């Protein structure tokens, strides 16, 4: 799985600077109640400052040069006869599992070489009383913190660029078209390309303009059926906080979505800030996000990949939810679990998804809770694995959630067929935090009490007890004072 930021398609920092590509022809428009939560009495500790990066003895290549070089190589790989692309049998095998995989779909088999916990890991974990709060300047145990000094001019860290290299090679091995071919298709429809944004595993994204649109637009060109699936979903949706589909073109088997261009994705927006957002701005972002989630759930749709990279923003009062490539339709009742399968991003997946259990629309509530947490803290991601090539599989992610939140054994689902309960309940045996009280991670972050309450309710461990988006919108944060 690529790093979370790889699928960022709206961030202006990471895009390649290139001259506008003139249009060739004129296009034809195809169509114009959960558990009670008890806050503890102790106050939250201030978030420690970012760590100072260690000096390097070697001068690495420019990040902008690496990004441009990567895009140029991708554009030449299929067209250069000296470097033919051979079919990768392992890629074919992956295609048999999920032929139309969207961006950042979690593939557990890719982590076969990851070191799992030892055999005695099913025993008790360290209890809440055994965790010593870190001194000032240290990071909380196991929680990733982004340092502004690690982010280069392109908006990517060195680890993220390495992940992009691997993901781009994987996309080509699965039969993806190079950016040069995709650019010709886009300009052939009358668009002028002003820049190529970070390529994704299912297609290319271009910053474009067209005489039919008064402002810049984003053209997302994808070769997998997941792009067509996303187009069908977007055509059904009409909500101010959901990314609208302006137009749709299908050329040579490639589906091109025309979307409005926002200033940045929420991940990039938060990374650029020096300080966290205020309570009114956090409430505005949270209200719009939960309103969009409530709307799609009432339409019988589960997004399954809600994260800051898939939320686009002009201002905190103007955001929208996008990237529906991993979405699916509800089967049966919204409250009845169904085995939809794993999809989305491991770091933001709900525990029941990671365990392979049937699930409901409340998996989106868990992911939305993580987004609201990042919006409030702005420089850290809860439950995220350390960066680098060795990122833990689903098993390690569940263990990380249990450890960092100090999940109590009584907070697991009582359902006898729950894999999450049968396989992982024993790992919470040593956790001493009383059930349904403030999770352990709240000790390390200072948040408005109403924001903290909202996040904790959204991150209810048992999906059956997790509140709906409509219920969360009734919490004190959204009530006028």
UniProtKB/Swiss-Prot annotation:
Binding site for ATP: 197-205, 220
Catalytic residues identified in the record: 305
Post-translational modification comment from the UniProt entry: Phosphorylated by UL13; this phosphorylation regulates subsequent phosphorylation of UL31 and UL34 by US3. Autophosphorylated.
UniProt catalytic activity: L-seryl-[protein] + ATP = O-phospho-L-seryl-[protein] + ADP + H(+); L-threonyl-[protein] + ATP = O-phospho-L-threonyl-[protein] + ADP + H(+)
Broad class of the protein's primary localization: host cell
Subcellular location: Host cytoplasm; Host nucleus
Pfam families: Pkinase
Region described as Disordered: spans on this chain: 12-63
Keyword Calcium among UniProt keywords: no
Top-level division of the source organism's lineage: Viruses
Annotated GO biological process: negative regulation of protein import into nucleus; negative regulation of protein localization to nucleus; symbiont-mediated perturbation of host apoptosis; symbiont-mediated perturbation of host chromatin organization; symbiont-mediated suppression of cytoplasmic pattern recognition receptor signaling pathway; symbiont-mediated suppression of host cytoplasmic pattern recognition receptor signaling pathway via inhibition of RIG-I activity; symbiont-mediated suppression of host NF-kappaB cascade; symbiont-mediated suppression of host T-cell mediated immune response
SUPFAM superfamilies from the UniProt entry: Protein kinase-like (PK-like)
GO molecular function, one term: protein serine/threonine kinase activity
Enzyme Commission identifier(s): 2.7.11.1
Gene Ontology cellular component terms for the protein in this record: host cell cytoplasm; host cell nucleus; viral tegument
Top-level class of the enzyme under EC nomenclature: transferase
Subunit structure: Interacts with host LAT; this interaction prevents LAT activation of TRAF6.
Family: Belongs to the protein kinase superfamily. Ser/Thr protein kinase family.
Cited function: Multifunctional serine/threonine kinase that plays a role in several processes including egress of virus particles from the nucleus, modulation of the actin cytoskeleton and inhibition of host immune response. Phosphorylates UL31 and UL34, two critical regulators of capsid budding from nucleus to endoplasmic reticulum, thereby facilitating virion egress. Modulates and redistributes host components of the nuclear envelope, including LMNA, emerin/EMD and the nuclear matrix protein MATR3. In turn, facilitates nuclear pore impairment and capsid release through impaired nuclear envelope.
Designated name of the protein: Serine/threonine-protein kinase US3
């Amino acid at each position: 799985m690529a790093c979370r930021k790889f699928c960022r398609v709206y961030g202006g920092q990471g895009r390649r600077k290139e001259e506008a590509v003139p249009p060739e022809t004129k296009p034809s428009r195809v169509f114009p109640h959960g558990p009670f939560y008890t806050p503890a009495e102790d106050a939250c500790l201030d978030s420690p400052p970012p760590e100072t990066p260690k000096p390097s003895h070697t001068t690495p290549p420019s990040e902008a040069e690496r990004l441009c070089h990567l895009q140029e190589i991708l554009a030449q790989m299929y067209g250069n006869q000296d470097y033919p692309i051979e079919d990768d049998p392992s890629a074919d095998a992956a295609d048999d599992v999920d032929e139309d995989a969207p961006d950042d779909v979690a593939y557990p088999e890719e982590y076969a070489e990851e070191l799992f916990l030892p055999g005695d890991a099913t025993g008790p974990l360290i209890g809440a009383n055994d965790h010593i709060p870190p001194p000032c300047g240290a990071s909380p145990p196991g929680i990733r913190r982004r340092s502004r000094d690690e982010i280069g001019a392109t908006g990517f860290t060195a680890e993220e660029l390495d992940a992009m290299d691997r993901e781009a090679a994987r996309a080509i091995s699965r039969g993806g078209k190079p950016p040069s071919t995709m650019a010709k298709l886009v300009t052939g429809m009358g668009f002028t390309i002003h820049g190529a944004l970070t390529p994704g595993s299912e297609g290319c994204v271009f910053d474009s303009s067209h005489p039919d649109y008064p402002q810049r637009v984003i053209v997302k060109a994808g070769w997998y059926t997941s792009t067509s699936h996303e187009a069908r979903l977007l055509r059904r949706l009409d909500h101010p906080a959901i990314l609208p589909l302006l137009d749709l073109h299908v050329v040579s088997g490639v589906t091109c979505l025309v979307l409005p261009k926002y200033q940045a994705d929420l991940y990039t927006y938060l990374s650029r800030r020096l300080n966290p957002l205020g309570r009114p701005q956090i409430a505005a972002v949270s209200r719009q996000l939960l309103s969009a989630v409530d709307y799609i759930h009432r339409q019988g749709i589960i997004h399954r990949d809600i994260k800051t990279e898939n939320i686009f923003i002009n201002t905190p009062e103007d955001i929208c939810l996008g990237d529906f490539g991993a979405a699916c339709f509800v089967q049966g009742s919204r409250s009845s679990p169904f085995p939809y399968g794993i999809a989305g991003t491991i770091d933001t997946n709900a525990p029941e998804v990671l365990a392979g259990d049937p699930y409901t629309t409340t998996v989106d509530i868990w992911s939305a809770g993580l987004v609201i947490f990042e919006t409030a803290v702005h420089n850290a991601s809860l439950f995220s694995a350390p960066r680098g090539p060795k990122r833990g599989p689903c098993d390690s992610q569940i263990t990380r959630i249990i450890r960092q939140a100090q999940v109590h054994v009584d907070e697991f689902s009582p359902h006898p067929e729950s894999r999450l309960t049968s396989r992982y309940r024993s790992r919470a045996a040593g956790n001493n935090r009383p059930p349904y009280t403030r999770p352990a991670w709240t000790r390390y972050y200072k948040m408005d009490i109403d924001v903290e309450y909202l996040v904790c309710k959204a991150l209810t461990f048992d999906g059956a007890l997790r509140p709906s988006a409509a219920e969360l919108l009734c919490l004190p944060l959204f009530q006028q004072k």
